[in-house]
């Protein structure tokens, strides 16, 4: 069975660029690199149907012959609209229709074996909170959270989350460290 890898990260690359004082091209280049790395290992890539870094990673993954892209999307636009998600669904090898946005955001961290955090945003913080609660209530999903320091504002996760899940966090300094880590998993 292939390793399932979920990606969580910002949808607004322009805002991320402003907050981190790094050019948008830095994040786009890193997304390309991560997608290329993930395409070299036998894994399923899980993302939400939205723009941003996760989608850019997924595009690079597919461009480099990644085996299976699973895209989650909400069946109902509640409590937030979903029309903007439609254009991303066509890239999927497998579509997972979730009941609503909660289940879409939750299952991108709960169904994969490993979750990779590629930057912070308000949406990413909610997904990190779901990981924290899964860990607190011994759901053991995901089994490992990878956080890439060069993509995080302060090179770490928020301490309110980090302190609760430190046993499952692996920090990697750069995206190039990801390939070595995944080959050892």
Model-assigned labels for residue ranges:
Residues 1, 184-185:
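Generic structural signal for short, solvent-exposed loop/turn connectors between secondary structure elements
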Residues 1-14:
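N-terminal nucleotide-binding beta1-loop-alpha1 segment
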Residues 2-5, 43, 143:
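Nucleotide donor/acceptor-binding cores
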Residues 42-45, 167-168:
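Short active-site oxyanion
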Residues 94-102, 166-184:
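Short acidic-hydrophobic, aromatic-tinged amphipathic segments that line or gate anion-handling sites
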């Amino acid at each position: 069975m292939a390793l399932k890898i979920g990606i969580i990260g910002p949808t607004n690359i322009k805002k991320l660029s402003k907050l981190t004082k790094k050019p948008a091209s830095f994040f786009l280049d890193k997304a390309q690199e991560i997608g290329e790395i993930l395409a070299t290992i036998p894994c399923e890539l899980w993302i939400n149907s939205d723009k941003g870094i996760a989608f850019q990673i997924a595009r690079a993954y597919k461009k480099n012959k990644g085996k299976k892209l699973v895209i989650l999307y909400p069946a109902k636009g509640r409590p937030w609209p979903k029309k903007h998600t439609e254009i991303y669904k066509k890239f999927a090898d497998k579509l997972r229709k979730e009941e609503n946005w909660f289940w879409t955001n939750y299952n991108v961290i709960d169904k994969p074996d490993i979750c990779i955090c590629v930057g912070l945003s308000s949406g990413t913080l909610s997904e990190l909170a779901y990981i924290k609660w899964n860990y607190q209530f011994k759901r053991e999903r995901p089994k490992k959270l990878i956080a890439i320091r060069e993509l995080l504002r302060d090179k770490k996760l928020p301490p309110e989350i980090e302190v609760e899940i430190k046993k499952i966090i692996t920090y990697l300094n750069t995206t190039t460290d990801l390939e070595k880590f995944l080959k050892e998993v």
